[in-house]
Regions:
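A residue-identity detector for tryptophan
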Residues: 22, 104, 119, 125-126, ...
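Extracytoplasmic/secreted cell-surface and envelope-processing proteins
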Residues: 34-38, 65-68, 124-128, 198-203, ...
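Surface-exposed loop and adjacent secondary-structure segments within mature catalytic domains
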Residues: 58-90, 113, 117-167
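Structural recognition of the beta-strand scaffold that forms the well-ordered cores
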Residues: 23-27, 55-60, 114-118, 189-193, ...
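Terminal, contiguous helix-loop blocks that mediate binding/assembly
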Residues: 2-17, 140-287
């Protein structure tokens, strides 16, 4: 059974006194073999840090101590310094847990634009996704939790080992993102998936009504995932950029970070408003 509540503990969020340009929310499902990678990525985020125009917010569920924490990442801060709230164990595969994190972020750190990053393992949509992925890379890819026995509509992201391997399947993700749209009164500006196999047209089609731009990889990601220091330093320096511009920068930063070590990777940004055009073209082509 999925958990639907959060036991609050620790400190309280410091409500932002003004509206920022961006709130960058990272939902980190680290209750699995990515726990250490989560801490490294938080350290990368702290190299940039939040500013008056950019809030960097994280919710991390860890496997090591079975706690969930919320952070506002500051420059030079990180896991030990920036924790705002601490809860008991949560199930990252429960849509309500994701929704609660976003609502907390929106209520306390309002902004002109919002980016939501889903951080974990992903299993995309297509049955043959694993066979199409890149071969062994220099660093271990995030592949150990792929679930290819599920029906396509049930392929997932944000797996939680201590909640029976529960995850957000594509239908749950569609519903919770629709709820977030209602909360915002508009589409989410940018949805990022720092996970394997998630940036497929089939996934984007299900999410098209809730997000403006989608960023992710259609094949496996290495364990190191996104280069958050580079991504967020640019956002902090240019906080007035729109979602499409920011998405292009994420893609360029990701590809450049692996080019130097010679790894085969993919990352792309999709204009979700054009997904219906792709769908119509596919239908006409195959009729």
């Amino acid at each position: 059974m999925k958990k639907t509540g959060i036991d609050r503990g620790g400190g309280e969020a410091q409500r932002s006194s003004g509206q920022a340009k961006w709130t960058f929310m990272v939902y980190m499902a680290g209750d699995n073999n990515l726990d250490g990678a989560a801490l490294r990525d938080i350290a990368e985020m702290a190299k940039a840090g939040s500013t008056k125009d950019v809030h960097i917010l994280v919710q991390l569920d860890r496997i090591e101590d079975q706690k969930t924490r919320r952070f506002r990442i500051t420059q030079g801060g990180g896991f030990k310094k920036d924790c705002i709230e601490s809860f008991g164990d949560t199930n990252t595969g429960d849509p309500q847990i994701l929704y609660s994190f976003v609502k907390w972020a929106v209520d306390n750190y309002p902004a002109d634009r919002y980016a939501l990053i889903l951080w974990n393992h992903g299993s995309g949509w297509w049955e043959d996704a694993k066979s199409r992925a890149a071969g062994p890379a220099g660093r271990q890819p995030r592949r150990s939790l792929f679930s290819h026995d599920f029906p396509p509509a049930h392929r997932s992201i944000c797996y939680d080992d201590t909640s029976g391997g529960d995850a957000l399947d594509n239908r749950e993700l569609r519903v919770v993102l629709a709820g977030i749209c209602t909360l915002l009164g508009r589409k989410i500006d940018l949805l990022g998936m720092d996970a394997c196999l998630m940036n497929m047209v089939e996934v984007a089609y299900q999410l098209r009504d809730s997000v403006s731009v989608i960023v992710g990889s259609e094949i496996e990601e290495p364990f190191d995932g996104w280069p958050y220091a580079e991504i967020l330093s640019r956002l902090a320096a240019r906080p007035r950029q729109d979602a499409a511009t920011f998405a292009r920068w994420i893609v360029r930063s990701y590809l450049a970070s692996y080019k130097v070590v010679g790894e085969m990777v993919t990352q792309s940004a999709l204009d979700a408003s054009r997904i219906n055009d792709v769908n119509r073209h596919a239908i006409m082509t195959h009729l």
